[in-house]
């Protein structure tokens, strides 16, 4: 349903040759799976400030020709609900990706809640604040250039490498989390980052690309490959055996609950889908128990 809307917006494209769909560190496989070669980016950290139960540090890092801004939040204590014995030196970390139009500052309510549980987070101002233009990205891809949605995934992977370089954080206990479209990026990034321990996806779903393409009659292989490359459902087989924890309101005001159920059904175990009743799109306090349990399963 969702990807069908995208296809409707752009219409059926002409046969534009994909002259270049890979580079030394970026490629898209024939099945639509994106792949990146990631290394730790250059980054700068500001002076830390104390905010409630944690330290807050502004981050700037270079990624694919742009400067990306983030907020690093480190809890004052290292014990987490998943590490009751406190026998590890490092704090587990989360790459936290807001939904479209949401800034890193507005995402700090959830980041503070995660700090309460003992998790460090790095929250990004995503490119275009997470707003996507599928038509423009498709044109870029067919021309052989990187779409913005691909680069956003690169940004998330780079953020994970920054977390791994922070002395207080355990580099082997990193997960991805996101809300709405940020959760789609989080799922894909987790699939590509084999070192990560799982993904927490709030108020999201995949695009159902294969069914939508079949219904629309699109035959251009590169167009189909692009749509599959931005669909988190393409990457679900790469998540297991790491956990996928989905949390969704049955009264979500943007994404119907059955779409989340469809995506969840395509994932392999271990997986969980927690439903709540709040009438919002995105995080609400009713999700706290599911978040705590889902993260505990990733870090235990």
Which sequence ranges carry the predicted segments?
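N-terminal cap/lid segment of alpha/beta-hydrolase-fold proteins
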Residues: 37-88
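Short beta-strand element of the alpha/beta-hydrolase
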Residues: 87-99
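Cap/lid segment of the alpha/beta-hydrolase catalytic domain
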Residues: 101-154, 208-217
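Primarily recognizes the serine-hydrolase "nucleophile elbow" in alpha/beta-hydrolase
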Residues: 157-221
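C-terminal catalytic histidine-bearing segment of alpha/beta-hydrolase fold enzymes
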Residues: 227, 265-300
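Short beta-strand/loop motif that positions the catalytic acidic residue
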Residues: 239-240, 245-248
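Acidic catalytic loop of the alpha/beta-hydrolase fold
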Residues: 250-255
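Short alpha-helix in the alpha/beta-hydrolase fold that links the catalytic acid
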Residues: 256-264
